[in-house]
């Protein structure tokens, strides 16, 4: 098995904070493994995910994903990396209550500048996959 993710001695220091957000964190994830991140409020989970996803950069240390040192990516490369390699599942989701279910599903695709035809096709595929096609025209609640 090859190493998919290598986190080596990551530290994240925030200005005016008494302790680091991350303090010399190191671990590896091998291809095919799953990793769960748990901890108390304020323990650094969100900070870790932010640096792993290139939303933030560590103060020191290195992160390699597929052999690439991700904190050295340009903003454009980092955006492409997030789009093509990462997925997020949020604990608490947010729907725009002024939009229909269909429009809420379409928001990320619209932000990616997909064509209207592509958006409609993908939204319908997802709606059918999750059994919510009959709910698409309803306002989100």
Where are these regions (language model features)?
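ABC ATPase NBD coupling module
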Residues: 70-87, 116
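The feature captures the beta-strand-to-loop junction immediately N-terminal to the Walker
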Residues: 38-40
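Conserved ABC ATPase "signature" region
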Residues: 6, 69, 117-135
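Short beta-strand immediately N-terminal to the Walker A/P-loop
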Residues: 35-36, 88
